[in-house]
């Protein structure tokens, strides 16, 4: 009986860690990656960025009220 409780607790901890990684950790890493590379990427890397946004979209929605990276102002050369 005690072994079942320990096993269930370990499984619960594993699920919580995976959910935390999916909803909080990986989207934060993707946000930081997008912020640093957005203006200098190639077309293939941009497709990879869109894939990451699609993959971690639920976590992006969780973090979006707290992280707001605005675009840089464009320098217009005359």
UniProtKB/Swiss-Prot annotation:
GO terms for cellular component: plasma membrane-derived thylakoid membrane. Its EC number is 7.1.1.-. The keyword Protein biosynthesis does not apply. It is found in: Cellular thylakoid membrane. Pfam families: NdhL. It is an enzyme of class 7 (translocase). It catalyses: a plastoquinone + NADH + (n+1) H(+)(in) = a plastoquinol + NAD(+) + n H(+)(out); a plastoquinone + NADPH + (n+1) H(+)(in) = a plastoquinol + NADP(+) + n H(+)(out). Disulfide bonds: none annotated. The chain crosses the membrane at residues 10-30, 47-67. Its main location: membrane. Belongs to the complex I NdhL subunit family. NDH-1 can be composed of about 15 different subunits; different subcomplexes with different compositions have been identified which probably have different functions. This is NAD(P)H-quinone oxidoreductase subunit L. It comes from Trichodesmium erythraeum (strain IMS101). The gene is ndhL.
């Amino acid at each position: 009986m005690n072994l079942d409780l320990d096993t269930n607790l370990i499984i619960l901890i594993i699920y919580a860690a995976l959910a935390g990684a999916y909803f909080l950790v990986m989207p934060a890493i993707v946000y930081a990656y997008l912020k640093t590379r957005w203006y200098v990427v190639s077309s293939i890397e941009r497709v990879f960025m869109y894939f990451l946004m699609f993959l971690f979209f639920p976590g992006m929605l969780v973090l979006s009220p707290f992280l707001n990276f605005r675009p840089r102002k464009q320098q217009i050369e005359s």
